[in-house]
Amino acid sequence: MKHHWLAWVACAATALAGGASALWQGEEQPRYQVESLRGRVVWASEAMRRLHGVESDADAAEWLIVLETPSGELHPLVKDARGRAFYKDERLRQMDLELLVRRYPGTPLLKVIRLYRLRDGAKYELDYWCDVCAITMYELKECECCQGPIRLRETLVKP
């Protein structure tokens, strides 16, 4: 009987370990993919009109931003700490960009992680900088520390 009990414990432990291992492996699978995409960020309504002749309601003109790739693909961007910059700073919508993004399964929306300007064969990381407080921010606004002005900063990315 004693050996029977030990065999049962060994089987249960193996089953639990296998289940825990499968559960752990499931958690390790990424919830998103990281990608790098190039193009220009534009208003979705403007891109749909220009590319497909689709008109939007007037109140939707500046409602959604998308990354338009050179091949004409439109990728909508999440409006969050990074994505808000495209709504607030028109200069960003005039630049050739490379965006490092997260793509989540089941949604076309992309979350911007980093943004780079492509100019004259070089790549520059973009953010906002307060010269007084020496802090980085990710959208155009007053400095979070001193409430003073901040500037768009371009930092050369070395190959």
Question: Which residues make up each language-model segment?
Answer:
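Cys/His-clustered metal-coordination modules, chiefly Zn-binding fingers
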Residues: 112-159
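Bacterial N-terminal signal peptides that target proteins for export
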Residues: 1-9
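Structural detector for short beta-strands of small beta-barrel domains
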Residues: 30-61
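Short, charged beta-turn/beta-strand-edge "cap" motif at the junction between a beta-strand
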Residues: 102-108
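Short nucleic-acid-contacting surface segments enriched for D/E, G, S/T with interspersed K/R
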Residues: 81-98
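OB-fold (S1/OB) nucleic-acid-binding surfaces
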Residues: 53-78
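Bacterial N-terminal signal peptides
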Residues: 8-17
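Transition segments tied to proteolytic processing and entry into folded domains
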Residues: 20-34
